[in-house]
């Protein structure tokens, strides 16, 4: 049995669905929301690489590499903000983050 593009798209759809459900079902924990966003970005990357390989074009793979770098920067900045917020407030609940004024 050969692994075709439909297998990659199925895995990507499952990851995307898990990410969306993670955001909508768990709105209290900011870390879970960040992890769900990372799952969604990973699903997009799998789609881009799968279609890039299917169409014999390298553009999708280059875009996937750019998305990975942006996702890594987003995760690092998001976690750094959460660490500072936890040190100041003692909690990382979404309700407490919504009360920030600046």
Swiss-Prot record:
> What InterPro entries does the record tag this protein with?
NADH_UbQ_OxRdtase_chain4L/K (IPR001133), NUOK/Mnh_C1-like (IPR039428)
Q: Does the keyword Membrane apply?
A: yes
Please name the source species. Answer: Sinorhizobium fredii (strain NBRC 101917 / NGR234)
Its GO biological process annotations read: ATP synthesis coupled electron transport
The protein's UniProt keywords, in alphabetical order, are: Cell inner membrane, Cell membrane, Membrane, NAD, Quinone, Translocase, Transmembrane, Transmembrane helix, Transport, Ubiquinone
Protein's UniProt name: NADH-quinone oxidoreductase subunit K 1
Supply one GO CC term from the record: plasma membrane
Top-rank lineage group of the source organism: Bacteria
Q: Which NCBIfam families match?
A: PRK05715.1-2, PRK05715.1-3, PRK05715.1-5
A molecular function GO annotation: NADH:ubiquinone reductase (non-electrogenic) activity
């Amino acid at each position: 049995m050969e692994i075709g593009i439909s297998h990659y798209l199925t895995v990507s759809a499952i990851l995307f669905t898990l990410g969306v459900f993670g955001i909508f079902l768990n709105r209290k924990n900011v870390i879970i929301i960040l992890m769900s966003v990372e799952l969604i970005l990973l699903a997009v990357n799998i789609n881009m690489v799968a279609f890039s390989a299917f169409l014999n074009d390298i553009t999708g793979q280059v875009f996937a590499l750019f998305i990975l770098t942006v996702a890594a920067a987003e995760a690092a900045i998001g976690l750094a903000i959460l660490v500072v917020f936890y040190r100041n407030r003692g909690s990382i609940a979404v309700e407490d983050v919504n009360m920030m004024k600046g």
